[in-house]
Regions:
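Beta-propeller domains
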Residues: 38-64
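Residue-level detector of conserved catalytic or cofactor/ligand-binding positions
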Residues: 278, 282-286
């Protein structure tokens, strides 16, 4: 399998930790192991799975998707296929929630992240639903945050929260719009949802792929109202559009954020940033 190393051998690492195209990354830790997946559009096998022991040294171990269950993908389809996925671990199983912007939201599951992964199962048949992320709550409820693709459905800047059937993981209720970023967070998309210490967090990129920023929403109730705060932006650095990714906590309790940077012809490379808490109100990536 492919291995990617950006350790500079003095106790430090250099960004990007994945200096090649792994767009729209999501990652989790299970025990001592980290796993990362990314979008792959119409390339197959798709939605690559990477493994790491330290968030710096990565190895590609498999793919979540062997084929797309639609005849149209027998031919190239620019801008279609698998968009920003989410990776979660629940009750001994790995779940990858994967959007196809023209067909809907799907999931695949596995007991071993290297595979085999199940055939895609439809969560919601819909055009324009993208960037899904599930959350299994403490009371057994299951939710899914997602964004919209204006190119498909005419809706933009909004995050919706739907309720899923705990057994089938299919949408049973199209929930409310829990955040509208039209004025303050244009192009709000790519939600990643977490629950920590009684708070619901939704991490959203905003501002667009090339020059956007990272925003965090939080609320005490899953349906809000959500506070918002920009936690990372380019500033005076050379890292354009640092946003969209995963909040991961290491075994030692330290928090880290994996996100992409659009390097144009080189693709979307992945950076690793340490995180800290600021006045116990929000999280910030350095």
């Amino acid at each position: 399998m492919d291995r990617y190393v950006t350790d500079i051998k003095n106790g430090c690492y250099q960004n990007p930790v994945l200096p090649m195209d792994f767009s729209d990354p999501d990652a989790i830790r299970v025990g001592e192991d980290y796993y990362l997946i990314s979008s792959s559009f119409t390339y197959l096998p798709g939605v690559p799975v990477l493994h790491s022991k330290d968030l710096v040294h990565w190895e590609r171990i498999g793919n979540c998707v062997e084929r797309l269950p639609f005849d149209r993908y027998a031919q190239p389809a620019h801008g279609c296929g698998t968009w920003a996925p989410a990776l979660r671990y629940h009750a001994g199983r790995f779940y990858a929630f994967i959007p196809l912007p023209d067909e809907g939201i799907f999931y695949t599951e596995a007991t071993d992240p290297a595979g085999p992964w199940s055939a895609l199962h439809c969560v919601k048949s819909a055009s324009g639903w993208i960037d899904p992320c599930p959350l299994w709550d403490d009371d057994g409820s299951v939710y899914m945050a997602h964004a919209f693709a204006k190119s498909r459905c005419g809706i933009k800047h909004k995050i919706q929260l739907s309720r899923l059937d705990p057994e089938t993981l299919e949408v049973v209720e199209d929930g409310p719009i829990v955040f509208d970023g039209t004025l303050s967070q244009p192009t709000a998309e790519g939600p990643k949802m977490y629950k920590r210490n009684g708070w619901y967090y939704i991490f959203i990129p905003a501002g667009g792929v090339e020059y956007g920023w990272q925003t965090v929403l939080r609320a005490r109730n899953v349906y809000g109202p959500y506070e918002e705060k920009i936690v990372m932006h380019q500033g005076a650095s050379s890292i354009n559009g640092p946003h969209q990714g995963a909040w991961v906590t290491a075994p030692d309790g330290s928090d880290w954020f994996l996100h992409f940077q659009d390097r144009f012809e080189l693709g979307r490379v992945v950076h690793l940033q340490p995180m800290c808490s600021v006045s116990y109100t929000h999280l910030r990536a350095h």
